[in-house]
Amino acid sequence: EASSEGVPVMAVSLETKAEDIMATSSESVGFGKATEATKLWIGRVLEEVYEKKNEAYRFLNINIPAGDIDVKGYRMTFVENQNYYVLRRPPERDWSKPYCLSFSIDVDEEKLHRGSDIQTVCQDRLISVTPITMDMTRNTLSRF
């Protein structure tokens, strides 16, 4: 919604273990470097979009490796064509009660493409910054 109103957008994710994905506590997941990196990118996005008129920075997907990383170390990336999360088959259960789907993180590292978002985070341990566009059809339509 923000993007459709002309407001710059950042989707920021921190690499975590599957069992910690729903954690909101900094005790189980270290949010310190992710917070630092997010602050840095907020400033960069505002400067690029509003001062330099660089539209490529209007909508970014930012993925941050876990651990003690250099928050200034990043790569502009593209979306990898394999899944990072794999849903697990749910057990038999009472369908009248809420259930949280479980998943595993399953990356085929040998099939990763150099410069992709997953490869950059998982192998090179750099922040992945992927420009996203809301207009995903303009270029494709010209091929029909």
Locations of regions flagged by a protein language model:
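Secondary-structure boundary elements
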Residues: 3-10, 44-54
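Glycine-rich phosphate/pyrophosphate-binding loops
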Residues: 3-26, 30
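Short acidic/Ser/Thr-enriched loop-to-helix initiation segments
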Residues: 22-23, 29-48
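C-terminal accessory domains and tails appended to enzymatic cores
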Residues: 29, 46-144
